[in-house]
Amino acid sequence: TPLDSLKYYKGFLHSGFVCMDTEMGDVKAYVGDIDYSHFRYDMAGQARRQVGSTIKPFLYALAMESGYSPYDLAPNEQVTYQVGDQEWTPRNDSQSRYGEMVTLKWGLAQSNNWISAWLMNQLSPELLVGLIHEFGVQNMSIEPAMSLCLGACEISVLEMVAAYTGFAKEGMRRAPRFVTRIEDSEGNVLATFVPQIHHVISRDAAWKMVELMRGVMDGGTGSRM
């Protein structure tokens, strides 16, 4: 029945995947969904979903641009922040090193929400929104809220992958390039498409971000990879 068909197709897990070359921005692989003949909504480029902790490198990049160092210290403790006429108390999964002063590098490596909230309070949600847009994210409805530092916004897979190229290439973001050139049947080049490169953060801040993000893989939440 039509109802059975709806239930069947609603049971599928949908996802998107993008692989980019950080040198030129060439898109090497792009998967919009399971099967275009049945699912024509592009989960990689059209769909925007909450990004969670993948937003944190942008917060730390803002901190590095503002003069912070990966080895600056922050209090690892739960704090209640006054946001307008409301209170916001972020939670954290781990109690490791609770009450200690820890480095920002440790905070990102452990994806610690308390350190992110502390940084957000030292900086500005408005500045973070501005930097996210500088990194190529086109969602203009991102709210400059404290909870943004924990991923309370929606970004597409394509936007996020392209944005991360700014960390890999010394602060120079590559826009996605799907076509390098167009030729006719005789091999004559009709059009070429040069890489679109945009400056997003300073070279110094980018190097600091490489140091910070390396910690995620060396001894943080990504160490199992």
Kindly label every feature range from the protein language model.
Residues T1-D21, Y30, Y36-Y41, I55, ...:
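A penicillin-recognizing enzyme superfamily signal
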Residues W88-N92, L123-A162, G171, A175-F178:
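Mid-domain, small-residue-enriched loop/turn segments at the edges of structured enzyme/sensor domains
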Residues M24-G25, R48-N76, G107, A163-F167, ...:
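Active-site SXXK
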Residues T22, S37-H38, M64-D72, Q138-M140, ...:
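Secondary-structure transition/capping motifs at alpha-helix termini
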Residues Y68-L128, R173, S185-V210, R214-G215:
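Conserved catalytic neighborhood of penicillin-recognizing serine enzymes
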Residues E23-M24, I34-H38, Q50, V79-Q82, ...:
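Solvent-exposed loop/turn segments at secondary-structure junctions
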Residues G16-M20, K28-Y30, D72-L73, W106, ...:
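Structural recognition of the beta-strand scaffold that forms the well-ordered cores
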Residues Y9-S15, H38-F58, Y71-N76, V102:
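Short active-site loop at a secondary-structure junction
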